[in-house]
Amino acid sequence: VSTAEFTFLGFLPHKKGRETLFKEIASSERAMVFYESTHRILKTLESLEKHTPKFKVVIARELTKVFEEFIEGTPAEVLEYLNTNKEKQRGEFVVIVVPR
């Protein structure tokens, strides 16, 4: 993943402005990095699939811990992986969205 230029967003808003932010991510030419909770990771991937279906997504799960893991693909591919592997839906997530 090229991270020569990226924007760090912190945690995304819960409701107000969330869809607007996904539209901004879709129109960006730089990588976007943000945190996501275990309770919202699937909804976030669904929104990314809607707004950025061809972008590359990397989910960094449990960074700096024993079970650190990186999952990458399109939003649909990552969503399918997490739906198939329910135990992977837990933990702390860093999400990187990269335009193609």
Model-inferred region functions:
Residues 1-28:
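Class I SAM-dependent methyltransferase SAM-binding "motif I" and its flanking Rossmann-like core
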Residues 30-31, 35-100:
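A contiguous loop/helix-start segment that scaffolds small-molecule binding in enzyme catalytic cores
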